[in-house]
């Protein structure tokens, strides 16, 4: 068992080089509407780097523990002042597994809330890809709030914060005096639950910080 630091070295974003590229589809289990991302990543990416890529692409804030489960082996980390990894994920790259097309593995985020992600290798190619890597090429659904409590509680909260309840809240605004400060806070709260759109451009802006 080894111990190392978290993400530090930049990923190679030079699109002129021809190197193995993996196309991954990441799906968050147990939520509806579906939350998923399709990513292009260099096969030489380490497990530690993939953790950061998935956090940025999905929209998580990296506030909790995580674990990868690949072919029955677990790779994860813990916080102790700074983020640290165990089982060598900061040096072990995906190429070492020789992942095949259509092969799957799992990514677990937050051991209390249990956000489980299914990761599927859709394609493996050695052809040149234009643009920086890693990159999100498709996706749908906004990531749940960090403190939503897991898929079941999140789905229950969506029912509480549905469109009907939102209209009732609008009616209460019409009936009473409005404090602008409180209104802004409450409106932001409703947007968290009602706006389920995925902003791919914003996700790629976050991912570009890893390629520098």
Task: Report the location of each language-model feature.
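Short linear regulatory motifs enriched in tryptophan with gly/pro/ser
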Residues: 1-212
């Amino acid at each position: 068992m080894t111990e190392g630091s978290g993400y530090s070295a930049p990923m190679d974003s030079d699109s002129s080089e021809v190197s193995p590229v993996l196309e991954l589809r990441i799906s968050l289990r147990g939520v509806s509407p579906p939350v998923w991302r399709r990513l292009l990543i260099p096969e030489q990416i380490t497990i530690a780097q993939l953790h950061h890529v998935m956090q940025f692409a999905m929209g998580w804030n990296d506030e909790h523990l995580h674990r990868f489960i690949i072919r029955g082996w677990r790779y994860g980390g813990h916080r102790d002042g700074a983020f640290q990894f165990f089982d060598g994920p900061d040096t072990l790259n995906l190429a070492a597994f020789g992942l095949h097309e259509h092969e799957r593995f799992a990514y677990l985020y937050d051991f209390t809330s249990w956000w489980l992600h299914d990761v599927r290798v859709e394609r493996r190619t050695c052809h040149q890809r234009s643009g920086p890597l890693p990159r999100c090429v498709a996706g749908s659904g906004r990531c749940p709030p960090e403190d939503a409590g897991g898929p079941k509680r999140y789905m229950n909260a969506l029912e509480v914060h549905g469109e009907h309840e939102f209209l009732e809240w609008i009616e209460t605004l019409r009936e009473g005096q409005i404090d602008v400060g409180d209104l802004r806070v409450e409106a932001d709260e409703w947007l968290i639950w009602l706006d389920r759109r995925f902003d791919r451009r914003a996700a790629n802006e976050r991912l570009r910080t890893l390629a520098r």
